[in-house]
């Protein structure tokens, strides 16, 4: 309760023999499986998710919990984050990848076969519309605003002191 003077570091050690970086499945030929050092986020799309215990929980100097509580909570945080992520990816990764593939395929198809031809058609028709628009503005709108400008330009304001 604040009497500890040394900072306790909590770390989890796992032997490489009993720990597999894969999903726990044994691979007969390690050359054919993905390397554990492979960068799965080469463009840094999810760098904001690199969050540790210290980024979420912090105790100021004046209020410290017991060292054992701090160590156990740190270990529980890391283990639960790891295990729940693994369980959720087992349950959701393949279906969501399938849905995302369908979504991106649909959007690509719509963009290629509908959006781009529509935009090209509009750009092809716009010079004709531009000519008609200039004729309308030069024939009707420009004279109207020119007349209004002449009317309002003849108004003068004089202020006299009282």
Swiss-Prot record:
Region (Disordered): 19-40
PTM field: Phosphorylated on serine and tyrosine residues. CAV1 promotes phosphorylation on Ser-23 which then targets the complex to the plasma membrane, lipid rafts and caveolae. Phosphorylation on Ser-36 appears to modulate mitosis in endothelial cells. Phosphorylation on both Tyr-19 and Tyr-27 is required for insulin-induced 'Ser-727' phosphorylation of STAT3 and its activation. Phosphorylation on Tyr-19 is required for insulin-induced phosphorylation of MAPK1 and DNA binding of STAT3. Tyrosine phosphorylation is induced by both EGF and insulin (By. similarity).
GO biological process: caveola assembly; endoplasmic reticulum organization; insulin receptor signaling pathway; mitochondrion organization; negative regulation of endothelial cell proliferation; positive regulation of dopamine receptor signaling pathway; regulation of cytosolic calcium ion concentration; skeletal muscle fiber development
Intramembrane features from the record: 87-107
Pfam short name (any one): Caveolin
PANTHER family: CAVEOLIN, CAVEOLIN-2
Protein name: Caveolin-2
Source species: Didelphis virginiana
Gene for this chain: CAV2
């Amino acid at each position: 309760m604040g009497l500890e003077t040394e900072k306790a570091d909590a770390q989890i050690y796992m032997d490489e023999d009993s720990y597999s970086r894969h999903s726990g499945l044994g691979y007969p030929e390690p050359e054919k499986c993905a390397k554990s050092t492979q960068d799965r986020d080469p463009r840094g799309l999810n760098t904001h998710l690199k969050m540790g215990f210290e980024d979420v929980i912090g105790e100021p100097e004046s209020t410290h919990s017991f060292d054992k509580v701090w160590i156990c909570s740190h270990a529980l945080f890391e283990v639960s984050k790891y295990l729940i992520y693994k369980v959720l990816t087992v349950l959701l990764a393949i279906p969501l990848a399938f849905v995302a593939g369908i979504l991106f395929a649909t959007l690509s198809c719509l963009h290629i076969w509908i959006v781009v031809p529509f935009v090209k058609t509009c750009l092809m028709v716009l010079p004709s519309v531009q000519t008609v628009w200039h004729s309308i503005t030069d024939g009707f709108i420009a004279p109207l605003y020119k007349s209004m400008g002449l009317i309002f330009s003849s108004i003068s304001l004089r202020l006299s002191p009282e």
